[in-house]
């Protein structure tokens, strides 16, 4: 079996077209997508949310805090592009996932996983400065900035505590064969849900190429073309090339 979870999430251009309808139907509205990998469903989802690069780093956003329960439920039932954040707010308030399922037809499985995130957020809020809770928060995919907001502190303070407690990510190899037979691919994902680092560090000089992220208005496949040629040039010069990206090319 596979020991990782992959999440693909669409990138919608409504930030460029604020007057366009954000309700989803059979008409294609996404310009691109992101792909994230984690050891748990919760970690993978929260990494995907951040990878969209639209200013959000959690499944709850300030926009929905002033909405009533009925407004949020009605809105989520209409399949808007941002209903994930409406669901996050409803679950944060303690609404029964079964009620949300009845209104939206979203599987209880997915709602229960979202509830795991919102429930732990409250537990984290009650345990400010706890190294054990910080370790679990990172395992569930919470970012340092989101933890800082929950604890009402600075991102630097969260980072310093992580360093002090040695709460660091490891890199796991993508197993494309589900352990059916031994394989090696130079394809890794970062996670806080493990202790063994599977990446092999060589003594060669290295150059990192940052990928352009999800396709959006004004940023398309021409950046992938540039990335490929950058990699070829780096290798031709005798360096080891490393790509960091939040979208599968």
Residue ranges and their predicted role:
Residues 1-249:
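ATP-dependent carboxylate/acyl-activation modules
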């Amino acid at each position: 079996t596979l020991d990782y979870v992959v999440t693909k999430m669409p990138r919608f251009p409504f930030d460029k077209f604020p007057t366009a309808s954000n309700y989803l139907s059979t008409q294609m509205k996404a310009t691109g997508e992101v792909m994230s990998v984690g050891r748990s469903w919760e970690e993978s989802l929260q990494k995907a949310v951040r990878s969209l690069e639209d200013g959000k780093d959690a499944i709850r956003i300030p926009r929905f805090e002033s909405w009533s329960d009925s407004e949020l439920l009605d809105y989520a039932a209409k399949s808007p592009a941002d209903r994930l954040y409406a669901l996050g707010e409803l679950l944060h308030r303690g609404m029964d996932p079964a009620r949300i399922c009845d209104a939206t037809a979203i599987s209880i499985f997915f709602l229960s996983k979202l509830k795991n995130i919102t429930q732990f957020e409250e537990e984290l809020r009650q345990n400010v400065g706890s190294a054990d809770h910080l370790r679990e928060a990172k395992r569930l995919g919470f970012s340092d900035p989101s933890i800082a907001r929950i604890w009402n502190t600075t991102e630097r303070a969260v980072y310093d505590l992580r360093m002090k407690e040695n709460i660091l990510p490891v890199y796991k190899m993508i197993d494309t064969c589900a352990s059916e037979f031994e394989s090696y691919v130079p394809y890794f994902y970062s996670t806080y849900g493990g202790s063994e680092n599977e990446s092999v560090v060589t003594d060669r000089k290295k150059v990192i190429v940052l990928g352009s992220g999800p396709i959006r208005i004004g940023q398309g496949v021409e950046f992938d073309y540039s990335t490929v040629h950058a990699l070829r040039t780096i290798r031709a010069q005798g360096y080891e090339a490393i790509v960091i990206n939040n979208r599968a090319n």
